[in-house]
């Protein structure tokens, strides 16, 4: 009898943990879906809502390291001044790995289908749960 109760308790703990992990991963995937939708509507301001709105946000790209949400937004506006330059964005997630209760590491590919020529590359994202919200705190895209 005690073994049965212990087994049930262990199963309940595991089920709770798995559910919490699945909920976090689904939320992170939803952030990326929202970013894709905003991009494809030509709305960089909404696209940036997936990022940590802080001066410590780190973005690493072909121009080097950029710190800060506002500076990252300005760089996006310079690099993608209109919807022709933005094209249509698609993410392909290769890995979504939990590092701890408050951090996830995401690896994927990005692709822009554009009338002026398609481009694409790879990315790594560090998501952090801040004030109960998952946001990108570091983005390395190439």
Language-model regions: role of each:
Residues 4, 8-50, 71:
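Short, low-complexity N-terminal intrinsically disordered segments enriched in polar/charged residues
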Residues 44-99:
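A solvent-exposed, acidic/Ser-Thr-rich amphipathic alpha-helical stretch
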Residues 52, 63, 95, 109-110, ...:
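A mature extracytoplasmic/lumenal domain signature
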Residues 76, 91-97, 110-112, 122-128:
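Hydrophobic/aromatic beta-strand elements that line small-molecule binding cavities or substrate pockets
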Residues 83-84, 112-119:
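Short, cysteine-centered beta-strand-loop-beta hairpins and adjacent loop/turn segments enriched
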Residues 101-110:
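A short hydrophobic beta-strand element
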Residues 120-142:
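Short beta-strand edge/turn micro-motifs at domain boundaries
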């Amino acid at each position: 009898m005690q073994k049965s109760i212990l087994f049930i308790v262990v199963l309940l703990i595991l089920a709770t943990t798995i559910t919490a992990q699945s909920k976090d991963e689904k939320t992170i995937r939803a952030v990326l879906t929202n970013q894709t939708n905003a991009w494809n509507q030509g709305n960089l301001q909404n696209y940036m809502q997936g990022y940590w709105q802080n001066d410590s946000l780190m973005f690493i790209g072909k121009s080097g390291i950029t710190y800060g949400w506002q500076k990252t937004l300005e760089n996006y506006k310079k690099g993608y001044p209109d919807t022709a330059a933005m094209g249509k964005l698609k993410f392909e997630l290769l890995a979504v790995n939990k590092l701890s209760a408050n951090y996830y590491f995401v690896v994927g590919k990005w692709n822009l289908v554009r009338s002026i020529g398609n481009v694409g590359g790879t990315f790594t994202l560090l998501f952090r749960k801040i004030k109960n919200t998952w946001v990108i705190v570091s983005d390395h895209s190439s």
